[in-house]
Each structure stands twice: as structure tokens, then as C-alpha cells.
Amino acid sequence: MSMPLGVSVNSHQSASQVEHIADRFSAAAKHYQEHNCLQRLSGASLLQGFVAKGAILDIGAGPGTDFANRAMGEEMRVYALDIALGMLQQLKTIYPEHQCVCGNAEQLPFVDRSIDCIYSNLALQWCHDFSAATSEMARVLKSGGEAHLSIVAAGSLAQLSNLGLRVNGFLSLESLQAAFDDTDWQFLDVKLMPMTVYFQDLKALLYSIKGVGASVQSSVQTVTSSESDAHFGKLRGRHDWQALQQRAEQFREAQGLPLTYQIAQFRVRRQGGSV
């Protein structure tokens, strides 16, 4: 199987939406590890029952990898795929043994039936067409190979909605499940799990979203990772910011200010036999 040996670029990625998301995540790369508490929590859950072997495709690997603490041998090869070149450049300096591929989950730059298992932790919610991503995973995955996926689903970030902030729209569990063609896939386990992370203050809570390349909107202005050096108090005006902080304090719990995500987890097998 021919694979890129360093950081490579998928020439098919030209859509402005993909480029915009990639730019946001590249800008967030250096600060990603400071804000990825949800990713760590979800990854720990997703890795339970995941058997790493052969050629592993990590979709949306970011600047790190959930396989960092696993023994790497000749029988295990990790291909770290991300749309953000900045993320992969940082990953390559820390994990030089991994193959870094800059590419899009909807147009995977791998040959048919070349991957033994697929892992993706909180990345596929950014797909413009999730059904295209499931079709691509079915194409590159060997018969009997499994895909373990966690995806941010509808109902996430309810606390932000309660504060009057608009957030990215996410697909429901039912819509996500419908994107898997039952002629290609066998469902082994599907579940929706709430995951709550806590923060010392509202600024830290909002930066946790900005720091991983996502965005929220107020009625005044979009808050994105391109403004990562700006103080949130300046974005709405000092008075509005103080009022927003006061409203947020109404939701404080003993652990801090909560932010709850609805995480859809899929364990699916490629139809066509066992490996």
C-alpha cells in the first residue's frame, strides 16, 4: 500500500468551507492541548474496547494522538489524517513514527480496502456531508474492519444557548445513524452520552471552544479562533460582558461552570466477513 511518508496535501481540498475550517484549526494548533479536556474525556471512553492493530486511520488526529501511550510495532501503523496542516506539523514533531496526511474525511486519500481499523474522536461533526464520509470509510476499510467514532451531536452546549449565544448546529443521533448504508455497515454499538466539562470562569469556558477551532456567535459578532488573542470582554462591550458573566454564574456548580456535550458513539463493522 502506497502511503505518504511525511506531511502531504490532498489536492482535492479546494472548497472554501473546508479551507475555512482548516484555517481555524491550524490557528488553534499551538493552544489545542490547553483546551481539549472534552477530547481527552471522550477519547478515554472511545478507546475502551478498541483493538489497535494493522493499519489504523485516525481521522481528525489534531496535534496529538490518542494512541500515544500504546506500543508501536511493525504490526501497527497509525495514519494521522487532519484537514489542518498546522495540526499535523505539530503532531509530526512529537510523533515522528506516525504517517501524517493532510486530507478530508469526505475524500480520503487512501486506496480501497487498505485500512484495518478507523478511529475518530470528535472530528466528523465538521463534515459538510457526513454520508460522504461514511461512504469513504466503507471504501478504504477492509472487510470485517471496525470504525470507532465519537461525534458531537444535537443538544450540545445547552448552557451557551441559555446565555443567548448561538452555536454550531449538530446532527441528531438518528440523522448520523441514517448516514450509514446498511449494505456496507453492521452496527455493533450505538449510544448517545452526555459529557460535561467544567471551567473556572466564563472566559475559560469560551476559550475551550475557541481553542479547538470551533465558534460561537452572539447577537453582535462571531467569536472565532482567529481572534484568539482578543479579550472576550471587548467583543460585546464591557457592560454586556459583565452581564453575561453574571448570568453564567447562575449555572455554577461545585466543580465550576459546566458545559455539556451530547456525544454520539458508534462502533460499526465493515460488511463482508471478519478479520
Curated annotation (Swiss-Prot):
Q: Which reaction does it catalyse?
A: malonyl-[ACP] + S-adenosyl-L-methionine = malonyl-[ACP] methyl ester + S-adenosyl-L-homocysteine
Keyword Iron-sulfur on entry: no
EC number per UniProt: 2.1.1.197
Which pathway does the protein contribute to? Cofactor biosynthesis; biotin biosynthesis
EC supergroup of this enzyme: transferase
Task: Enumerate the UniProt keywords alphabetically.
Answer: Biotin biosynthesis, Methyltransferase, S-adenosyl-L-methionine, Transferase
| CDD domains membership | AdoMet_MTases
Does the entry feature the keyword Magnesium, yes or no? no
Tell me the GO molecular function terms.
Answer: 2-methoxy-6-polyprenyl-1,4-benzoquinol methyltransferase activity; carboxyl-O-methyltransferase activity; malonyl-CoA methyltransferase activity; S-adenosylmethionine-dependent methyltransferase activity
**Matches recorded under Pfam families:** Methyltransf_11
Q: Per the UniProt entry, what are the Gene Ontology biological process annotations, in alphabetical order?
A: biotin biosynthetic process; methylation; ubiquinone biosynthetic process
Annotated function: Converts the free carboxyl group of a malonyl-thioester to its methyl ester by transfer of a methyl group from S-adenosyl-L-methionine (SAM). It allows to synthesize pimeloyl-ACP via the fatty acid synthetic pathway.
- Its family? Belongs to the methyltransferase superfamily.
Q: Return the protein name.
A: Malonyl-[acyl-carrier protein] O-methyltransferase
Instruction: Please report the organism this UniProt entry assigns to the protein.
Output: Shewanella oneidensis (strain ATCC 700550 / JCM 31522 / CIP 106686 / LMG 19005 / NCIMB 14063 / MR-1)
What gene does the UniProt entry assign to this protein?
Answer: bioC
